[in-house]
C-alpha cells in the first residue's frame, strides 16, 4: 500500500569542480531499498574516469527514458542494477544537484521501496566495465559509515551530500510509519 509523507526537497550545488554552465538536465530515479530483515541495498561504484579514481556507495537508480513514468523507471532500474522486484511504498523526495565537471544538472527522484524478490541483475556494459557496479546489503549504521568513508573523494562528497539526508528520512519513515 503506497502512503504519502512529507517529501524532502533539496537544491545542492557542486562545490568540488568549477561551474562552467549546464548543457543538459537529467531526470533520475533512485531508491532506498530495504528488506524484511532490516537490510538496505546499495551499489558500490568503482570507477576511474574524469571524476578521478573513486570507490563509493550510491543508491541504485538511473536515468528516466523519454516518455517513461517515474515509477515504471524505478522498477526497471532496480531490476537492472540490483536484480530486485520491489513494492514502492512512497516518494521520499527530490534532490536537485549538479555535476559541474560534465555540465549536467541532475533531478533525482527518490523512492522508498521494499524488496519483494531478488533475481538476476541486468547491468549495462558501462555499469559492468566502466563503473564496476556491485551490490551491497548493509545495515543502516553500516550504510552511514560507507557514505562517510566516501567523503574522502570529491565525487563521494557530492553523492554523500545528496543521499545521506534521503537515507536518514527513509529511516525515520520506516521507524515511525511502516509496520
Question: What does each of the following model-derived ranges do?
Answer:
Residues 31, 91, 109-111:
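A structural signal for short, well-ordered beta-strand segments
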Residues 39-80:
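Conserved Nudix-box catalytic region and its N-terminal flanking loop in Nudix hydrolases
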Residues 97-122, 136:
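Active-site-adjacent beta-strand/loop module that shapes the phosphate/pyrophosphate-binding cleft
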Residues 1-30, 36:
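Acidic, metal-coordinating catalytic segment for phosphate/diphosphate chemistry
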Amino acid at each position: 500500500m503506497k502512503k504519502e509523507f512529507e517529501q524532502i526537497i533539496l537544491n545542492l550545488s557542486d562545490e568540488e569542480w568549477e561551474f562552467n554552465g549546464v548543457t543538459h538536465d537529467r531526470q533520475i530515479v533512485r531508491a532506498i531499498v530495504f528488506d524484511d530483515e532490516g537490510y538496505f541495498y546499495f551499489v558500490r561504484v568503482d570507477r576511474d574516469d574524469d571524476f578521478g579514481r573513486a570507490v563509493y556507495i550510491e543508491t541504485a537508480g538511473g536515468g528516466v527514458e523519454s516518455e517513461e513514468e517515474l515509477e515504471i523507471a524505478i522498477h526497471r532500474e532496480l531490476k537492472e542494477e540490483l536484480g530486485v522486484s520491489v513494492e514502492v511504498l512512497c516518494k521520499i523526495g527530490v534532490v536537485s544537484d549538479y555535476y559541474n565537471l560534465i555540465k549536467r544538472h541532475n533531478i533525482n527522484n527518490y523512492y522508498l521501496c521494499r524488496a519483494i524478490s531478488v533475481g538476476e541483475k541486468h547491468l549495462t556494459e558501462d555499469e559492468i566495465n566502466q563503473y564496476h557496479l556491485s551490490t551491497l546489503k548493509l545495515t543502516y549504521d553500516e550504510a552511514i559509515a560507507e557514505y562517510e568513508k566516501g567523503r574522502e573523494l570529491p565525487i563521494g562528497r557530492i553523492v554523500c551530500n545528496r543521499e545521506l539526508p534521503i537515507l536518514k528520512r527513509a529511516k525515520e519513515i520506516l521507524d515511525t510509519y511502516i509496520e
